[in-house]
A protein has these predicted regions:
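Glycine-rich phosphate-binding loops of nucleotide-dependent enzymes
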Residues: 2-280
Length: 280
């Protein structure tokens, strides 16, 4: 069995009196495409925000390659050392910030496309490459020598070839058809050279042809870049076709997990999310 790239252990995320994620445990192994599905408001994007260090969980841990990178309140032996007011110290000591998690090889896309509207396709990807080298745009732009800059430009062009956007490299990002804007956002994530890619509703707003193309594209990039992928998606044909395994959450709580065949037959999943499939 391949090694774990991601593991969530008993993760809870509470906002005041609202429990967005409720004692969730899950794992993703190297090379897998795993989907996280559930109704709107089930806590899926909150899970992504916990994994990437945007949110610090109320309880639980996130592990990347078997190392804790995000932690809520301490447990076990650590609870004795860091109790009361010291619990916050433990969390600050363990939890990585989003930029540090990115440097560990994690990249994500968002439900709402976040491209630089005034930049070309090429520039959007080039900026993503720059940001992996230094901490801000200013230093990324002005501290590269000519040789490094030229190599980044070559790498950017090569990536655009791989993802099928070379012909559009000089077009403004916002001038692209919607499906290609989604592809560009994924290309920006790939520019950071991740080993673990999180896709938040990549098929949102796509027509059937674009969705079919996206399905093939995700398969291709997994193979080409040796990726492990976790995705949130409401498009069930895509989910069932592409996923090695599926986790289903409802009101932040895990209600089922397994292969697509198992999930499609699970009564709790049908009742909560998929709906009743009528006999033909």
């Amino acid at each position: 069995m391949s090694e774990k790239v991601l593991e969530l252990r008993d993760v809870t995320m509470q906002f005041g009196g609202v429990v967005a994620v409720n004692n969730l445990s899950m794992e993703v192994r190297k090379g897998e495409i795993v989907s996280l599905i559930g109704p709107n408001g089930a806590g899926k994007t909150t899970v992504f925000n916990v994994i990437t260090g945007v949110y610090v969980p109320t309880n639980g841990e996130v592990l990347l390659d078997d190392k804790v990178v995000v932690a809520g309140h301490p447990k076990g032996k650590m609870k004795k050392l860091y109790n009361g007011e010291n619990a916050g110290k433990y969390t600050r000591m363990i939890t990585k910030t989003p930029d540090k998690i990115t440097r560990l090889g994690v990249a994500r896309t968002f439900q709402n496309i976040r491209l630089f509207k005034s930049m070309t396709v090429f520039e959007n990807v080039l900026v993503a490459k720059h940001m992996t080298r230094t901490s801000n745009v200013f230093s990324a732009t002005f501290r590269l020598n000519h040789k490094e800059e030229e190599q980044m430009r070559k790498d950017t062009l090569e990536l655009l070839k791989i993802v099928g956007l070379e012909a559009e490299k000089d077009e403004l990002a916002t001038s692209l058809p919607y499906g290609k804007q989604r592809r560009l956002e994924i290309a920006r994530a790939l520019a950071t050279k991740p080993k673990f890619l999180l896709l938040d509703e990549p098929a949102a707003g796509m027509n059937p042809q674009e969705t079919d193309e996206l399905t093939a594209f995700i398969h291709d990039i997994r193979k080409t870049f040796d990726l492990t992928i976790l995705l949130i998606e409401h498009h069930m044909n895509l989910v069932m076709d592409i996923s090695d395994r599926i986790y289903v959450v409802d009101f932040g709580k895990l209600i089922a997990s397994g292969t697509s065949d198992v999930i499609q037959k699970d009564k709790k999943v049908i009742d909560a999310y998929l709906g009743v499939v009528e006999d033909e």
